[in-house]
Each structure stands twice: as C-alpha cells, then as structure tokens.
Amino acid sequence: MPGVTSERTASRFDAIPGPLGLASASLEGKVALVTGAGRGIGREMAMELGRRGAKVIVNYANSSESAQEVVNAIKKSGSDAVAIKANVSDVDQIVSLFDQAVKVWGKLHIVCSNSGVVSFGHVKDVTPEEFDRVFTINTRGQFFVAREAYKHLEVGGRLILMGSITGQAKGVPKHAVYSGSKGAIETFVRCMAVDFGDKKITVNAVAPGGIKTDMYHAVCREYIPGGTELDDEAVDEYASTWSPLGRVGLPIDIARCVCFLASQDGEWVNGKVLGIDGHAMM
C-alpha cells in the first residue's frame, strides 16, 4: 500500500490519514529531482510529487529494480518519470546526476535531497571510518547536492534538504554522529536561504521523527528500552505512545509536507526546518 515499503502484513498503524494526491498543492508543469528515491521516504516523496503533477527524476544508488518500480508508479498516476543512478557520497557523480537530469526535460524546478544513512554507537566506540561514512552522505553529500541545485534550478525553484528530529532538541544516547550529521543541515538551510536568494530559490529542510520505512523496526528498537525483545507490532504500539496523536509516522506524512514546500503554497517559507514528528516526546 502507498506509504509502506516493507513486505510484511499491514496493521492499523499503516493506515494513511486522508486521500492521496489532493490538488491543493498542484505541481503541474514542474520537474523534480529526488535523491535516494528508490526506497523509504524518498520513494514516497517521488511518488507524491508525481501524483501532484510533477515530472520526476528518480535517483538511486544501488537498486535499479526498486527505482524502476517508482518510475512505473509515477507514470501510472498520470505523470512522467525517469531513473538515474548516482551515489551522492561521490561529488563527481552528483555533478553528473544534475547534468543528466536537466537534459531529460530541459529544466529543473524542485530538488529534494533525501539520501542518508543511520548510525548508533557510544562516542567512545566511534571509529574515524564510521564518522566519515555518516558525514560523507548525510552532510557532505547534501551540501554538494545543494551546490548543484543552485547551479541548475530555475529561478524561483525549491530546494528541500533532509534533517532529523535528532538534529533538533532530542538528546538520544549513542546517536552523536548521526545527530551531528543532521544538525549541520539546519545551519546549511539558514545560510543557503540567503545565498540562494539571488535566484529566488527557497531553501528549507524537513526533520522527520519515527517514520515507518523498511528500516523502521530495526532502527526504532534502538530508541526503546529493551527494544530488541519486542516484535514488530509491539514496537509499533510503543512508538505510537510518543505522539499525542497515538500513531506512528508514515512516509506519506513527510511527502505531503515536502510537496507543500515545493508548491506555490510554500512560496514564503524560506530558511526553515519543519519538524514532522507528530509532536513526538521520546
């Protein structure tokens, strides 16, 4: 079902709130590029952009099959899409990605930077290799995606970076490297919003919390005391208590906010980090 990328049996925590593809934030005539769009949040972002009328460049690093599934789904929704392979840990590949992207439909209006990796570990155990792995993709990669976005976006375009609830006011044990890599994104946004102003491009970030992707259960257990002893349904039950709304977040929750920022409705939102966590109190 839309918004869920795993193969397991759906539960009440998978129910999507409200109908898909409402026209309130139409993106007809726009061209969007989404990095890391083959799975999880990036997948749903790409699909929702397509549902709202945008043509979508579906970037992926490894699985061409997953990326093609997203392309097919976007085409089925009535829009158009192509998949382009590039690993955002490599700046040369980022440059090539944008060069290829603008050649597809001749322009680019929206860039959504989504690629990222997660990491847990006490500070005393963090190796230079692990630090570099996380910052190379989550921080350095997003910076150079932003650099190329500035060069290639049309005047009045949109750049949306990917932060995290842990990069804001959440102190999570054994999460310093990941949280730090995401905290830097918030500073990028504030500074880039100024630099991008001469092209009338808005720069914002979304900061998701507890979103149910294919890696959700494994990662979520790290936030729950004794989480390794819980089955998937018990993880959902526990995680749902973090929000006063009594549910867990879904990729579509992030995708809808991204589409708002990408649309005309988000014109006057600039230099902001939008927390999307259901007011989670972890």
From Swiss-Prot:
Keywords, ordered alphabetically: Melanin biosynthesis, NADP, Oxidoreductase
GO biological process: any one?
melanin biosynthetic process
The broad enzyme category this protein falls into is oxidoreductase
What family is this? Belongs to the short-chain dehydrogenases/reductases (SDR) family.
Entry-linked PANTHER family? NADPH-DEPENDENT ALDEHYDE REDUCTASE-LIKE PROTEIN, CHLOROPLASTIC-RELATED, RE15974P
Q: What does this protein do?
A: Trihydroxynaphthalene reductase involved the biosynthesis of dihydroxynaphthalene (DHN)-melanin, a bluish-green pigment forming a dark layer in the conidial wall that protects the conidia from UV radiations. The first step of the pathway is the production of the pentaketide 1,3,6,8-tetrahydroxynaphthalene (1,3,6,8-THN or T4HN) by the polyketide synthase PfmaE though condensation of acetyl-CoA with malonyl-CoA. T4HN is not stable and easily oxidizes into the stable form flaviolin. T4HN is also substrate of the hydroxynaphthalene reductase PfmaG to yield scytalone.
Query: What protein name does the entry list?
Result: Trihydroxynaphthalene reductase PfmaI
